[in-house]
């Protein structure tokens, strides 16, 4: 059975981003895909400090949800990252998480499919999609494309 990890970067547990994530969960489950969703937008996640600990040990020096996500990410066949748009950018907590998650994990990501979900009142979606999809591109992960 295929597995997908969804990282919800919204600080609002029942906001618009969560509604979009729940819709994706339903579609995945209807198609026999195992889904694990983690809400990180309301967590205290530090940014990378470039200490090199992950290069030496394979895990981040900060023992928080990022190290837990690393194991889930390695097991998953796909990764969905979801975020509200703040000033044409993803939530800063999500970016800190993704910076550390992608930098500290050394497994091959080339066959893991990536997808981004963004929610905005007005503009900024294109810039935020670009910001999030670069994690997939840099890791040679195929992305699911942009659906609006």
Where does each model-flagged region fall?
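Cofactor-binding loop segments of dinucleotide-utilizing enzymes, especially the Rossmann-like FAD-
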Residues: 9, 40, 118-121
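A generic structural motif
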Residues: 30-36, 141-142
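N-terminal beta-loop-helix "entrance" segment that forms/cooperates
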Residues: 37-60
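Mobile beta-alpha loop/short-helix "lid" or hinge segments that flank ligand
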Residues: 39-46, 137-148
């Amino acid at each position: 059975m295929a597995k997908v990890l969804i990282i919800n970067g919204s600080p609002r547990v029942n906001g618009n981003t969560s509604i979009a994530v729940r819709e994706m969960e339903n579609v995945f489950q209807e198609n026999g895909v195992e889904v694990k969703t983690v809400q990180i937008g309301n967590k205290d996640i530090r940014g990378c400090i470039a200490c090199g600990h992950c290069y030496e040990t394979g895990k981040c020096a900060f023992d928080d949800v990022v190290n837990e996500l690393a194991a889930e990410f390695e097991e998953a066949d796909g990764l969905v990252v979801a975020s509200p748009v703040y000033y044409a950018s993803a939530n800063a907590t999500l970016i800190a998480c993704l910076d550390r998650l992608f930098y500290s994990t050394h497994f091959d990501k080339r066959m893991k499919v990536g997808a981004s979900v963004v929610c905005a009142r007005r503009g900024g979606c294109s810039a935020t999609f670009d910001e999030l999809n670069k994690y997939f591109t840099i890791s040679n992960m195929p992305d699911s494309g942009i659906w609006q």
